[in-house]
Amino acid sequence: MNNFFQYQDDKEYKYKILVYPNITYMKDLEKDSYVVVLRNVIKELNKVRDDIHWTILSPKHVMSLQFENTEQLMIDMPSYPNKMRTHFNADEILKVIDWRNSDYDVVYSHLPEQTLALKNLFHNSTNISPKIIGYSHWFEVKENSNYESTMLAQNLLGVLEMDECGVNSIWLKEFIIKKSKELFSDKQVKQLEEIIQPHYLGIDDVSPNHKYEPKTILFNHRDNDYTGYGWFVEQMDELYKTRQDFKVFTTLTNLDRPYAERVKLSSRKEYLNFVRKMHMGVGCFKTYSAWSISTTDGLSQGVPYVLPNKLCYPEMVGKDYPLLYNEKDFLTTIESMLDNPNAREEANTYLAPLLPDFKWSGRVLSWFDNWKQLDDLKVIQDTDGYQRILKFINRRKSVTKKEILEHLGWGVRVGWSSYRNRLRTEPTIKLTKNRYEVINK
């Protein structure tokens, strides 16, 4: 299924990016963190430039990834827990990307575990040599996974094939570099230190100062071990023994307790409208945490979160944030919030000057060296072969990649990307989604 929008073949797209997905929430892709990140990357880049076309590999069509400059190509892909990290169907991918007819200048991989295979597939089975960049949403380590075997080594091998790989925080970068020392040489660890860079995730907008329901506590995370869900329930059970004037709301799991209620919300708008009514949110992450989008969702709506004073959270909200806790002080902090209205106001007053910098618009555009990675693509010298391509385009005025290759008699063994990169620099040639055209003056 391709994009709903009808393409105009004469629209100039200097760069074509192929996105390799990371699917962990198949039952509702709109809520998958990968989709949330990619949607905001495309949206923010579209505000400042119109020369990128995105081809997104996906197991299902995702409405929120539907833009004028995107297309979605369907591939079979398993999902969580980690089958998607082990699955790679080279024949299907080759068929779908249609390399004889299509161009890809950059591969934006959101699944590092498959990036080494993906790079080899391009370099050895097509005539395309794209730049590889990426984002790692998750690293399988003992601190967050109870699998007998994990894919951490495979993940890092994929990262080593990238020019740059984003992670959600400096804390996570340092955590993974420490883990990598158990697996790789000093030279490879140094490479990882250069490749892995913090790409802070964002919020849609800042909308504080809403009326809230007093003494409500929001747990809007998954019920996994790494989120501290079991420990949180134990703490709430203890609190309920001494007071029954609070209520816990969950959004992703059912909690069978007299003090708890699950809410099921059908859209992001409905979700945020609910979140902003909460007195407080909580984060109970123990030994590992991604940059919690569920936490920043709440902060953006004026809901302060009680957060662990470790992992990425001092980096997220600052070391002086008044609701950072050590485990022994968790219930004391919760009760202070329940009983002292000023505690909520103090936390929001602290956050107010920080939140504008949380917006996606201020974060995405700084990634990949302000996206200058797109400008650093290998260009062929002015060869006889290049001149033949240039003359063919000028004579025909508008041609496809396949027509050029057939004219030259070139197949998979003649690299194409460096020729395309030189064509991009020609003042009289423009690159469109599927064609190379002479600019009419």
What are these regions (language model features)?
Residues 1-63, 237-241:
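N-terminal subdomain of nucleotide-sugar transferases
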Residues 106-108, 121-145, 159, 164-166:
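Active-site proximal beta-strand in glycosyltransferases
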Residues 33-36, 341-381:
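A charged, aromatic-enriched C-terminal amphipathic alpha-helix characteristic of glycosyltransferases
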Residues 30, 37, 204-206, 213-257:
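Conserved catalytic-core segment of nucleotide-activated headgroup transferases in glycan assembly
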Residues 109-115:
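Short His-centered aromatic/hydrophobic patch
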Residues 153, 158-193:
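A short, active-site helix/loop in glycosyltransferases that binds the activated sugar's phosphate group
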Residues 304-307:
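Short hydrophobic beta-strand element within catalytic cores of glycosyltransferases
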Residues 283-295, 309, 314-315:
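Nucleotide-sugar-dependent
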